[in-house]
């Protein structure tokens, strides 16, 4: 009977720790990942910098930051996004 109780306790602790680990990963989705792409015109003159989202994110995205500090999630395959990245890279030179 004692070994059955220990086995159940170990299973409970393992289940709790796995649930906690997956919940911690899910909390980052809204902050560091894009859930949708911006569909409007990209204000190239107002862009300051850009970065690619993590490979752990559900959607591959390029995030632009504007001079006002606004973050814009965009589709990396979009031709306007590629043009904006080239513009920002040329500004650094």
UniProtKB/Swiss-Prot annotation:
List the InterPro entries.
Chemokine_b/g/d (IPR039809), Chemokine_CC_CS (IPR000827), Chemokine_IL8-like_dom (IPR001811), Interleukin_8-like_sf (IPR036048)
- Please provide, alphabetically and separated by semicolons, the GO molecular function terms listed in this UniProt record: CCR4 chemokine receptor binding; chemokine activity
- The primary location reported for this protein is secreted
> What are the cysteine partners in each disulfide bond?
33-57, 34-73
The record ties this protein, via PROSITE patterns, to: SMALL_CYTOKINES_CC
Q: Does the keyword Transmembrane apply?
A: no
State any GO BP term from the record.
Answer: immune response
This molecule's function is given as:
Chemokine, which displays chemotactic activity for T lymphocytes, preferentially Th2 cells, but not monocytes or granulocytes. Therefore plays an important role in a wide range of inflammatory and immunological processes. Acts by binding to CCR4 at T-cell surface. Mediates GM-CSF/CSF2-driven pain and inflammation. In the brain, required to maintain the typical, highly branched morphology of hippocampal microglia under homeostatic conditions.
- Please report which protein family the annotation says this sequence is part of: Belongs to the intercrine beta (chemokine CC) family.
Q: Any idea what this protein is called?
A: C-C motif chemokine 17
The primary gene name is Ccl17
């Amino acid at each position: 009977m004692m070994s059955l109780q220990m086995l159940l306790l170990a299973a409970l602790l393992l289940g709790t720790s796995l649930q906690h680990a997956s919940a911690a990963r899910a909390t980052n989705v809204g902050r560091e990942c894009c859930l949708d792409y911006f569909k409007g015109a990209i204000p190239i003159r107002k862009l300051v910098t850009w970065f690619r989202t993590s490979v752990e994110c559900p959607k591959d995205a390029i995030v632009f930051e504007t001079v006002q500090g606004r973050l814009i999630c965009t589709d990396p395959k979009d031709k306007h996004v590629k043009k904006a990245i080239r513009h920002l890279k040329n500004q650094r030179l």
